[in-house]
């Protein structure tokens, strides 16, 4: 019996049950601890979607990883302005996931939604390419850049993001079934979905890794050529995606589920005093028994379970605020460090993707199966806690690293004065302002963030998919992805201070915030992995 079916039959009798049981069902789906339960093969249809996402991520990272240096050197923006624009782009890329979920659920279904937003995305990449031509710099440079980012690429990627990972996971058979060649062994749906999300996340990073390796090198020749490559790769991805249409299972649209959800929550809150005593306030939506409401008891019960699960997402905006430093502030730091002539400041993020690509198969094929055989359960909540802890340690390291960069000659903290208060001359070109500290000292930061992603980000995607009933999956996935938008808002606020000599304090504040959030998250949710 699935968690959704169990949820339909569950009767809550006290406040304690109402707090624990909905989440208990989510964790039951997320953790399987038996030697007789194994993951099944990933269907070919799911692989086509995963390959499409690889191409999309090549395009996204291949273009976006250039933005900071492009704005600083070509569009001549300050570090603070460039960071604010970058975080604004990230905000729109993730807040638009909600719109993408509505379009898929109400009108088009996931396949058509992904395809249409992919075309808009490609048009944005074309405009970005044209606006970066040197001869158009003064007229179209900044306006074309902003329009392509905020009106086209961000909407395109947002519409895709809210649907593509869920679409891949929905290609998995919905029920457990016996292994065809191993008697007594069961192909488990939950573990198979977990595998899909890990390989989906690995594809994201293979695409990102290739984009980060290729486009920065090409940008040395011409910006427009560097931006053209992501556009071409994404066209290839769209073709691959379209060719798989006959093989896809595409859940038909069932109306505006997000709108129905909001109306149900509002009605439940207004009628919370009419619910059965001892039940959650959402059960107020069941107060009318005359069939006049647009939802039934099952929808309300599913919504309650989803509501409890979504509490887990509350800390993610802080995590994403730290994570997004890779796209801007880490590049700001790298620009001012010594590095080989062949290495561009943003290319070190290649290491982040490489770590994920290497570690995910190791965890999937070796580590997690051994843990299951040993009877050790590493549930989703504990995996997320591990990810949060690692990124906290990463930013402690980055804070110390920035401190040493400011202590290094010849330009120290880039304010025009040395530690003795004597005036020093700062070159006009930001790329000429380099202190005696190697860019390779950034390697631990990229490695740590990569490992944290496997535990926090990939698990978050998986948890979001499992925490919702079928009709709410796109809504919940979009809400999880929207946490990145709120992380970008935090980054936009921090961008006010994201100029030299303030970066030590900016990094330290983020490390402290993430440490506090990790402690609170563990205190509030760690028990959920142990309640079954």
Where are these regions (language model features)?
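Hydrophobic transmembrane alpha-helices of multi-pass solute transporters/permeases
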Residues: 2-9, 14-178, 188-532
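Membrane-interface alpha-helices at helix entry/exit sites of multi-pass transporters
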Residues: 180-183
């Amino acid at each position: 019996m699935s968690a959704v079916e169990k949820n339909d039959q569950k009767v809550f009798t006290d406040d304690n049950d109402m707090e624990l049981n909905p989440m208990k069902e989510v964790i039951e789906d997320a953790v399987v601890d038996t030697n007789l339960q194994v993951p099944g093969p990933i269907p070919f249809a799911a692989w086509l979607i995963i390959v499409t996402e690889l191409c999309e991520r090549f395009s996204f990272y291949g273009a976006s990883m250039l933005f900071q240096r492009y704005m600083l050197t070509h569009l001549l923006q300050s570090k603070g302005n460039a960071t604010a624009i970058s975080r604004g782009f990230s905000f729109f890329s993730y807040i638009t996931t909600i719109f993408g979920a509505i379009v898929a659920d109400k009108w088009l279904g996931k396949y058509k939604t992904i395809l249409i937003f992919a075309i808009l995305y490609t048009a944005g990449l074309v405009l970005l390419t044209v606006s970066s031509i040197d001869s158009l710099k003064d007229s179209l440079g900044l306006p074309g850049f902003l329009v392509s980012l905020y009106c086209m690429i961000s909407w395109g990627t947002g519409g895709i993001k809210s649907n593509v990972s869920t679409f891949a996971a929905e290609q998995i058979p919905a029920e457990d079934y016996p292994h065809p060649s191993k008697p007594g062994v069961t192909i488990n749906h939950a573990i198979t979905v977990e595998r899909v999300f890990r390989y989906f996340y690995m594809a994201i990073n293979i695409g990102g890794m290739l984009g980060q390796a290729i486009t920065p090198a090409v940008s040395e020749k011409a910006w427009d050529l560097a931006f053209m490559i992501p556009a071409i790769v994404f066209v290839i991805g769209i073709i691959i995606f379209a060719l798989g249409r006959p093989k896809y299972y595409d859940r038909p649209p069932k109306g505006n589920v997000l709108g129905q959800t909001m109306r149900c929550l509002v009605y439940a809150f207004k009628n919370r005093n009419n619910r059965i005593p001892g039940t959650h306030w959402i059960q107020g939506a069941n107060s009318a028994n005359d069939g006049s409401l647009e939802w039934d008891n099952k929808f309300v019960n599913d919504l309650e379970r989803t509501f409890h699960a979504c509490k887990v997402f509350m800390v993610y905006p802080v995590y994403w605020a730290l994570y997004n430093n890779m796209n801007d502030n880490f590049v700001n730091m790298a620009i001012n460090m010594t590095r080989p002539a062949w290495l561009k400041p943003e290319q070190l993020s290649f290491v982040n993707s490489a770590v994920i690509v290497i570690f995910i198969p190791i965890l999937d094929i070796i580590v997690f199966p051994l843990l299951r055989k040993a009877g050790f359960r590493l549930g989703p909540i504990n995996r997320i806690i591990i990810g949060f802890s690692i990124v906290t340690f990463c930013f402690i390291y980055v804070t110390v690293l920035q401190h040493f960069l400011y202590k290094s000659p010849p330009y120290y903290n880039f304010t025009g004065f040395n530690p003795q208060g004597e005036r020093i001359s700062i070159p006009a070109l930001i790329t000429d302002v380099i202190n005696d500290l190697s860019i390779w000292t950034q390697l631990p930061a990229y490695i740590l963030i990569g490992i944290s992603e496997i535990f926090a980000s990939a698990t978050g995607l998986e948890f979001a998919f499992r925490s919702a009933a079928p009709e709410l999956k796109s809504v919940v996935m979009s809400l999880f992805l929207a946490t990145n938008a709120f992380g970008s808002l935090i980054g936009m606020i921090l961008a006010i201070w994201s100029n030299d000599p303030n970066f030590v304090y900016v990094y330290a504040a983020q490390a402290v915030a993430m440490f506090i959030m990790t402690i609170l998250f563990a205190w509030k949710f760690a028990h959920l992995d142990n309640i079954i």
